[in-house]
């Protein structure tokens, strides 16, 4: 098992998670005793204990006082916060994961974009007020797009959408930088932003779903033209 990590805690966490992913520690099984596991991984028991607590918070494990640590079925117990981990664990499936992520985001964003323009059109107008100053670079577009999503999610009146976005911020940011490296993708996005801006000015929230649907289809086609050339390390976080 080859694991790239920046320190003992990171190594231990990735070792355990990969072992769960590869069914060496299958769902429902009991982890080895703390001393045995710390020796197996090569970290101190203190470090291991901290890692186990963190993995329990993320839904990988169940820790109960006086009982052995049990491995969970993470598909049932974890949240969006493990998306980046799954991307690292399954690089061959990363393009499909991104497809699913973008599809889910498009479906959800149609709801909160409409809500934002209905409930707080002034905030939507403000968020889109500096389009002429947006630098024509992948980094600038990726940052603007995420911030726009975040602002409108919060302005929609349902802050839970913000938490959903926060769950895949790192992964979405990296994919966004790659997607917006295409000048055509940036031009497509700018056209969408301008149309959205006009809807906000007109307080026309009823036409937002149709605009979102059209942009979702067009950006999806654009993504399909780019996905096969994605860098192999795009799914890896900096941790």
UniProtKB/Swiss-Prot annotation:
Listed GO MF terms: DNA binding; DNA-binding transcription factor activity; fatty-acyl-CoA binding
A GO cellular-component term linked to this record: cytoplasm
Pfam families: FadR_C (PF07840), GntR (PF00392)
Main location: cytoplasm
Keywords: Activator, Cytoplasm, DNA-binding, Fatty acid metabolism, Lipid metabolism, Repressor, Transcription, Transcription regulation
GO aspect biological process, one term: fatty acid metabolic process
UniProt-annotated location(s): Cytoplasm
HTH gntR-type domain span: 6-74
DNA-binding region ranges: 34-53
Functional description taken from the UniProt entry: Multifunctional regulator of fatty acid metabolism.
Oligomeric and partner information: Homodimer.
Identification of the protein by name: Fatty acid metabolism regulator protein
Organism: Shewanella pealeana (strain ATCC 700345 / ANG-SQ1)
Higher taxonomy: Bacteria, Pseudomonadati, Pseudomonadota, Gammaproteobacteria, Alteromonadales
Gene: fadR
